[in-house]
Amino acid sequence: MEPVYATGKMVSENNPQQRVMPTLRITSYARSKAFYVEGLGFQIDWEHRFKPNFPVFMQVSREGLAFFLSEHTGDCSVGGLVHLYVPDVDAWYAEFQRRGVSVQEPPNQSLQGLRDMTIVDPDGNKLRVCTRLDDWKR
């Protein structure tokens, strides 16, 4: 059987602000898809598997932010951390509350000049959603 190759454009190619594509390790495609797509409102841009029923490697994105999710054990370990800089962390928080997403730490002001919140995915990866205080609508 021929390998299945990914198609679609890399979101970071269109976003000069983003030059690095982090990868988070996941252990269950179904659980992660439910969390990231249905819970957090990301879209799946593309998926790649070498064969059917093999581990997935995929890109998710939302509002110009993108990262990879991988079931491949050799790519990285669970328990990673990514920072997502957004214009209004409070709007994202309100949306996550409506969607029933459990937020580990609600938005608060940090010592780094940010207003941020922390979400933990089903595999223990942390997503820190941040707004720079200079950009925050007070």
List the model feature ranges, each with a label:
Residues P52, D75, S110-Q112, R132-W136:
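A short acidic/small-residue loop/turn micro-motif
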Residues Q18-S28, M58-S61, H72-R99, R115-V120:
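Vicinal oxygen chelate
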Residues S32-V37, F96, D121-G124:
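Conserved active-site tyrosine of GNAT-family acetyltransferases
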Residues E2-K33, G80-V82, T131-R138:
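N-terminal beta-strand motif that seeds the catalytic metal site of vicinal oxygen chelate
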Residues F68-S70, T118, R128:
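Conserved beta-strand in the GNAT
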Residues P106-N108:
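Diglycine-centered glycine-rich loop/turn motifs
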Residues P16, T23-L65:
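Core segments of cupin and vicinal oxygen chelate
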